[in-house]
Design a protein with these regions (language model features):
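N-terminal accessory segments
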Residues: 1-118
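A structural signal for short coil/turn segments at secondary-structure junctions
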Residues: 117, 146-147
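Walker A/P-loop
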Residues: 118-135
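A structural signal for short, well-ordered beta-strand segments and their strand-loop junctions
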Residues: 122-124, 152-155
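Walker A/P-loop NTP-binding motif
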Residues: 136-145
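Alpha-helical scaffold elements adjacent to nucleotide-binding pockets in ATP/GTP-utilizing enzyme cores
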Residues: 138, 163-171
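Conserved Walker A/P-loop ATP-binding site and its immediately adjacent core
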Residues: 153-166
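Conserved small/polar residues in nucleotide/adenosyl-binding loops
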Residues: 174-177
């Protein structure tokens, strides 16, 4: 049986069953080398359903599947990365998820920049919105995506750049869900 047929059959099952949704997710992991775009598009459905059923059913298995679904997309999807890296953070210390509604447009613009759909991105927002922290998340995401490539940063303040550098190192070393 071809992988695409396997995926189709997996998604025809009762996906409110944790085992069935897990099988559907596993089929997407098999599909990824053959059809990357379809695998990651369908994974958004797995993530939506696993979040819904985790809440409705109070299911730990669905909750964990939601985490695995985020991890599957995190190297390629900045929004998924931002949610995944804070998975184990104490809710009161989370940055992205509580502000996601406001920062999602900026995260999508940063995604477009990383995907070479934009040559330049200028972000102008009021102080305290979260530009710097989101930029730190972006730098760590880029560093993880392309560890062999350098990242150049500039600022009016050497102390600010030193702080950004140290925070990036902290994020890279201590963010392991």
């Amino acid at each position: 049986m071809e992988i695409q047929e396997l995926v189709k059959k997996a998604f025809q099952r009762d996906l409110s069953d944790p085992s069935a949704l897990n099988d559907a997710f596993d089929s997407l992991r098999l599909l990824e080398p053959e059809d990357f775009t379809l695998a990651h598009e369908r994974n958004k459905e797995v993530r939506r359903l696993s979040a819904k059923f985790a809440t409705e059913q109070k299911s730990i298995r669905m909750f964990e599947l939601n985490k695995r679904s985020l991890l599957f997309d995190a190297p390629y999807d900045f929004d998924a990365h931002c949610r995944y890296i804070e998975w184990n953070r104490e809710p009161s210390k989370r940055f992205y998820l509580p502000r996601r509604k406001q920062l999602y447009r900026v995260a999508k613009a940063l995604q477009r920049l990383a995907d070479n759909e934009l040559d330049l991105l200028a972000i102008s927002l009021p102080p305290g919105v979260g530009k710097t922290t989101l930029a730190l998340f972006f730098l760590t995401w880029l560093g993880g995506r392309n560890p062999e490539k350098p990242i150049l940063g500039g600022s009016h303040s050497n102390a600010f750049l030193r702080g950004v550098y140290e925070e990036c190192i902290r994020c890279l070393l201590y963010t392991s869900p």
